[in-house]
Amino acid sequence: QTCALPISRHLEVTRDIAIKFNGTFGPVFTVPDAAIAEEVAVVPGLDGQKMSKSYGNTIELFGDLEETRSRIMKIVTDSTPLEAPKDPGACTIYALYKLFADESARAEMAQRYRAGGMGYGHAKKALFEALAAEFEPMRRRRAELEADPAYVEGVLRDGAAKARAEARKTLDRAREAVGIV
């Protein structure tokens, strides 16, 4: 049983079932809480809306790097001139950059935006570089795993066996609480 789940309808249904069951038969299931950091509750898409596959505004983290660069370079911006100060808080590029850059890099970009002289093209390039650097180790690991499907199958088999054992314990407790032992 888990104590926290990402926010979704699954979380709501899981909570409802656990509360109803526990109220009827006693404390068997853990009632999960939402586990999502406030700063990433809504990730902006390339068009500034909430990032969503259905909106077609996503960044494919494991996709082709040139395609990713191209998509980032197409982020819609306003017509503020390069030399003019900009508000980082009102910029989709900066909102995405904050997710991948460290604190000093975020502060530096925000300062450069406010001072003027930093164009959106510069910011898009910095965003791409931060994203590529952040996900490079994961891209390498994914390539290694794709090259060894037998290993992946073994990990999945082992994980399934562990999950079945844990699920069995919970199911046994639920059966006992209901009286189906």
Tell me the role of every PLM-derived stretch.
Residues 8-9, 15-181:
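Conserved nucleotide- and phosphate/pyrophosphate-binding catalytic cores
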Residues 3-5:
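Short, small-residue-biased leader/transition segments that mark boundaries at the very start
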